[in-house]
Design a protein with these regions (language model features):
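Active-site hotspot residues in diverse enzymes, especially metal/ion-binding acidic/histidine motifs
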Residues: 1-227
Length: 227
């Protein structure tokens, strides 16, 4: 069985096709078909391991699902048949968050983030570039950057997800973000887009909050990155 560290090294060497190449290396069959109400699952049987992906999902979403299911296998965390990526991304379950972190590492190795984001602050255009380079969604790219905030020089970082103008959830390792505050910042950022907003942080120093929006008008969804 491939170890976690071996898997991460292999994914980095095969970027941006790490998860696909890793599944092949591990002898896992990846199948795509129409699934109702879920993005995919992994099943082990007498004939081997099969990862099923929803063929109706966008390619970036299928790639994250593949990496997520590989994470379940590598971390030996039981999977739930019929998982929705929307649910697992906002989950507070520790094991699911560990799986999501590993999925991000397989999709976007730290070396790639450092190379494409050589300086801070990180703004929407940089996240879009990172997402395209890694063949992932802007949301996946933003979450990966949040995980690596300290490593790339960000004191704080958070990603907040909106549907229309309605707050859905947020993820941060360092910030406690209230819905009311996030919604206020989001509305301010919408008025300034495509430029980021810069506001005083309210601390007793000269630090500022920098935030910007990546919109998906087709699905009426927005990834809001705050630092």
């Amino acid at each position: 069985m491939t170890s976690v560290e071996q898997a991460k090294q292999f994914a980095e060497e095969n970027f941006p096709h790490g998860p696909e190449k890793l599944a092949e290396k591990m002898g896992i069959e990846v199948r795509e078909s129409v699934l109702v109400g879920c993005d995919g699952w992994v099943l082990s049987g007498p004939d081997g391991i099969v990862i099923r992906l929803n063929s109706k999902s966008p390619v970036q979403r299928r790639r994250f699902t593949l990496a997520h299911e590989l994470g379940h296998l590598l971390l030996n965390v039981p999977t739930v048949v019929g998982e929705s990526i929307d649910d697992v991304l906002k989950s507070n379950d520790r094991e699911e968050r560990d799986v999501n972190l590993l999925a991000g590492e397989l999709l976007i190795p730290e070396s790639i983030v450092r190379r494409l984001l050589p300086s801070t602050p990180v703004v929407a255009s940089q996240l879009t570039k990172l997402a395209k380079h890694a063949k992932v969604s802007e949301l996946a790219a933003a979450i990966r950057v949040v995980h690596l905030a300290a490593e790339i020089g960000l004191e704080n970082a958070a990603v907040v997800y909106f549907k229309g103008d309605v707050y859905q959830w947020n993820f941060s390792k360092t910030l406690k973000i209230e819905e009311e505050w996030a919604t206020h910042l989001f509305k301010e950022a919408k008025r300034k887009k495509p430029n980021p907003i810069r506001l005083p942080s309210g601390r007793n120093n000269d630090s500022v909050i920098v935030a910007s929006i990546i919109e998906n008008p087709l699905l009426n969804l927005s990834t809001f990155f705050v630092q």
